């Protein structure tokens, strides 16, 4: 731990020496302290929040999300029409838009980007660790260029969240000519149409974006956006308090009261759509018994975790969907309150009164992972009180993600939905259609849930969709494929000189509207 802390502080010192930020950031540059180095800047290959927070400033999709909400607004498509049968979407693209390399944005460029992910015979085929487009939009029949500024996408079947998914970063549009020029190096040479463009990337030190003065939506007020990886929470806290950075997140929760009193910073908070849970391997010879999984839920003191570790920056999870999902959130499901006697009774009934041993996979840090090691230690102690020995195995985030999809006994995870549709949480994580390499890492399967979630995807009428997801939640919570822990609040800390910043429910850091005093 000490070595990692010193390494994180060394990175911060190196950043300050390079940028001159030790006293304060440049007057017209905004400095953001991220939790980790971005992994890639190629939209189809992004699986982490740190990469997404940067690349969303560089690239855009056909549709966008309104600032501060999941409401859809025009993006690179200025309008669209949907056929009566719900299978054909016709997009009218914005005229006179160019990529950062000067090449034109048009329908052929959009088709190229879709084709790259849908056609595994393409010489440029790439999806990264997780094939987002095939999972999100696997029922695409064709992507056709009608004319330079008109694109038509035909579906094999209706997909209710289709437009929502077009706002996901994996479907952002990039320069085909840049990809052809740089090939695999495109992961560090992003060329989009967005309000910022890449100026420099010094691995382990900083990523520098400069504003796109020719941006179709109007140039940002901030001249530069500088992102520095600061792995340790204490180092991020020190940097925001001294003014070395302008904005950060995931500082130690016990520091928030003092930060709220600091006249130089703003602590912005809101509930989120995120879920923090422990995936249980339902194929494990012991965990395949629902009674055991229920017992583990009763054995974990979630209220204590939120009170003592997270300092109130979360709410107890009832199930997979947070209250942010509004009518889709099923309030009647049980919370699995902390109840050791009930946990012991269930284990005895299942034949495991003497306890058993499991491997518990835990990341050292990562996108939205709150305080993973501290939380794991408490959960380990909770489980020990009912005879379950959870052997913690910690890994750095990149190695952890790979291991997570290799059927560990139990593993921590946080899911921060990029879109506001329940499909992105429930179908992606809990349908048997989404076994690894997709993200149903516990191999949970329930025929009734599968049927409800598939119907939810293809039912366009929202009033008809709501009861499908609410019923699915009841079954899922009863089955307990996860230890449902919490829905973390979004907490962003920024300096008072930052004006116009607004929280986004998917944890994005939108800077287009920001200005600096």
Residue ranges with predicted function:
Residues 385-401, 406, 427-495, 517:
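Extracytoplasmic/peripheral linker and loop segments enriched in polar/acidic and small residues
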Residues 25, 78-123, 152, 239, ...:
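Aromatic- and charge-enriched surface segment that lines or borders ligand/interaction sites
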Residues 212-258, 389:
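Ligand-site clamp/hinge motif
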């Amino acid at each position: 731990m000490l070595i990692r802390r010193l390494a994180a502080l060394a990175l911060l010192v190196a950043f300050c020496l390079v940028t001159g930020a030790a006293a304060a950031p440049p007057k017209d540059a905004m400095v953001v302290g991220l939790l980790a180095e971005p992994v890639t800047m190629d939209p189809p290959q992004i699986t982490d929040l740190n990469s997404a927070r940067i690349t969303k400033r560089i690239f855009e999709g056909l549709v966008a999300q309104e600032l501060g909400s999941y409401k859809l607004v025009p993006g690179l498509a200025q309008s669209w029409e949907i056929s009566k049968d719900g299978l054909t979407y016709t997009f009218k693209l914005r005229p006179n838009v160019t990529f950062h390399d000067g090449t034109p944005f048009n329908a052929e460029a959009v088709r190229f980007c879709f084709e790259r992910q849908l056609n595994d015979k393409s010489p440029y085929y790439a999806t990264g660790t997780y094939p987002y487009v095939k999972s999100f939009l696997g029922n695409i029949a064709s992507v056709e260029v009608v004319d330079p500024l008109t694109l038509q996408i035909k579906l094999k079947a209706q997909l209710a969240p289709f437009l929502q998914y077009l706002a996901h970063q994996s479907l952002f549009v990039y320069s085909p000519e840049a990809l052809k020029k740089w090939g695999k190096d495109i992961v560090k040479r992003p060329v989009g149409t967005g309000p910022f463009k890449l100026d420099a990337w010094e691995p382990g030190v900083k990523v520098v974006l400069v504003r796109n003065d020719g941006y179709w939506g109007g140039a940002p007020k901030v001249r530069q956006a500088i992102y520095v990886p600061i792995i340790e929470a204490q180092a991020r806290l020190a940097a925001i308090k001294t003014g070395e950075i302008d904005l950060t997140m995931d500082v130690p929760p016990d520091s928030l009261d003092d930060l709220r009193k600091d006249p130089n910073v703003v602590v912005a908070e809101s509930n989120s759509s995120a879920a923090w849970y422990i995936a249980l391997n339902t194929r494990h010879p012991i965990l395949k018994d629902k009674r055991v999984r229920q017992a583990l839920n009763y054995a974990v003191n979630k209220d204590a975790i939120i009170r003592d570790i997270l300092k109130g920056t979360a709410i107890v999870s009832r199930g997979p969907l947070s209250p942010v999902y509004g009518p889709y959130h099923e309030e009647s499901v049980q919370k699995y309150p902390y109840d050791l006697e009930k946990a012991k009774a269930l284990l005895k009934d299942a034949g495991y009164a003497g306890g058993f041993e499991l491997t518990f996979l835990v990341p050292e840090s990562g996108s939205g992972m709150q305080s993973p090691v501290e939380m794991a230690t408490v959960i380990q102690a909770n489980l020990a009180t009912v005879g379950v020995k959870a052997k913690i195995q910690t890994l750095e985030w990149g190695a952890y993600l790979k291991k997570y999809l290799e059927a560990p006994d139990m593993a921590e995870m946080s899911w921060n939905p990029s879109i506001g549709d329940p499909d992105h949480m429930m179908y992606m994580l809990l349908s048997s259609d989404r076994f690894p390499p997709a993200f149903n890492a516990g191999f949970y399967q329930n025929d009734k849930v599968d049927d409800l979630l598939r119907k939810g995807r293809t039912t366009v009428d929202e009033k008809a969709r709501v009861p499908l997801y609410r019923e699915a939640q009841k079954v899922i919570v009863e089955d307990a494929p996860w230890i449902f822990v919490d829905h973390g609040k979004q907490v962003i800390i920024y300096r008072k000189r930052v004006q116009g910043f607004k929280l986004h429910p998917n944890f994005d850091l939108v800077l287009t509207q920001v200005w600096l005093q």
